[in-house]
Curated annotation (Swiss-Prot):
A GO cellular component annotation in the UniProt record: signal recognition particle
GO BP term, example: SRP-dependent cotranslational protein targeting to membrane, signal sequence recognition
Similarity annotation: Belongs to the SRP19 family.
Protein name: Signal recognition particle 19 kDa protein
UniProt KW Transferase keyword: no
Compartments (UniProt record): Cytoplasm
Length: 101
């Protein structure tokens, strides 16, 4: 990877419509439906993660779909950062944060 200190966040990581075997890395209750690159970028910016958007990239598992990716600062485990980004998108969409059980 050319950018040290960065994590790659693919939209598939937080997409509620995808299965774990197709790329989702967080739970369905914390994921969002069909996240867009701009939503991920805005959420990462709100979290202070210095996002860089690469719209021409394709997720390797579905190489025929050019979904793009977002590079963010590496400030912890990828799953934790993906969950924070997803919850930030949910807040912005007005869905709210899921209740803790």
């Amino acid at each position: 990877m050319k950018d040290k200190g960065k994590l790659v966040i693919w939209p598939a990581y937080i997409d509620q419509t995808r299965s774990r075997s197709n790329g989702r890395i967080i739970s369905r209750k914390n994921a969002v439906k069909e996240p867009h690159l701009n939503e991920i970028k805005d959420a990462a910016k709100n979290l202070g993660l210095n996002p860089e958007v690469e719209p021409e990239k394709a997720y390797p598992k579905s190489w025929w779909e050019v979904s793009g990716r977002v590079l963010v600062d590496d400030r912890g485990p990828k799953s934790v950062i993906a969950k924070q980004i997803s919850l930030e998108i949910r807040k912005k969409r007005g869905k709210g944060v899921p209740a803790k059980t």
